[in-house]
Each structure stands twice: as structure tokens, then as C-alpha cells.
Amino acid sequence: MKIKRVFNAFLLVFILAVLNGCKIYSFTGTTLSADLKTFSIQNFSMAAAGGPQNMSLTFNEKLKEYYQRNTSLKFKNTDGDIHLEGSIIAYELSPVSATAGDRAAMNRLTITVEVKFVNKTNEQEDFEKEFTFYQDFPQEQSLTQAEPILVPKILDQLVLNIFNSTAASW
């Protein structure tokens, strides 16, 4: 009977230690300080020529939603503990590979976002940098046909890369 009581006590201590550890570590891979409670995102402007009219709005919403889903931080309109701002600075279409007739076999759509990140509790994490991602599509497909499929994929990857650089420190 005494062995069972000792075993139960050790089991209880083990469970409490594991549960307490969950407060420190995140299953989403974030490395954000426990001091951080809020985040703010100033609307990213569209500084690039071309692209869908609603691209900056779509990007802003995707970025906010990703932080809300993957952190415990609360959104504030301004002055969050961490703050992101920037603009979409490039929307480019370029040929990737040529065929025998000097035509592009594949085209590449590239989007670049300039980001300024501020962490009010740790200024060493502040940065300004560009994030770029692209998707290729066949030359037989027009940009008008490819845009509705490729732009959301590119924006999703840009959001993930920004999140990893700010919240996951990858």
C-alpha cells in the first residue's frame, strides 16, 4: 500500500512538471517571451506596380490571422508589444526557361515584401528586411489565369517566412 502511495505521489509530481513546462514551450514553435502580450500590424501598403487591387488588404488579413492562430498574443490596432509594418515593394513577372523558339517555357511570378519588426521588450530582435517568394507557371497560362491561384500561395509563404523570422526565430 505504501509503494502505491509513493508511486502516485511521483506520478502527480511528474504530471505537474509536464503541465508547467507547457507554459514555457509552445507546440507551434514560437520563441516569444512570456512578457509579450499584444501584437500590432500597421497596414502594409502597395508600393509595387501591378498585382491584384486587393493584394495588400489580403496580405494584411493573412498576417493578422496567422499571428492570432499561432500565438497567444492579442491584436491591438496600434502600439503592440511586437509591431510589424512595411509594404509590398515588388510584383514581378519574368521568364524562367526558354524554348527552341526563344519563348518562355515557364514564367515566374515574384512578390517581395519589405518588413520592419519591432519588439518592445527586446530591441536586439528588431529588424528591417525584405522577404521574397515566387511561383512558376506554364507559358500557356496567362497571368490573369495564374494570379488567382499563385498570389494566395505566395502570400501564404511570405506570411510563414515573416512569422518564422519574428515569432519562431528561425
Where in this protein do the model-derived segments appear?
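Bacterial N-terminal signal peptides that target proteins for export
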Residues: 1-10
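A structural "domain/chain start" motif
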Residues: 3, 19-61, 65, 72, ...
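Bacterial N-terminal signal peptides
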Residues: 9-21
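Surface-exposed short loop/turn segments
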Residues: 27, 69-74, 81-126, 130, ...
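A short beta-turn/loop motif at secondary-structure boundaries
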Residues: 32-33, 78-80
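Second-shell loop/turn segments in exported
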Residues: 46-53, 141-149
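Compositionally biased, intrinsically disordered linkers/stalks adjacent to structured regions
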Residues: 148-170
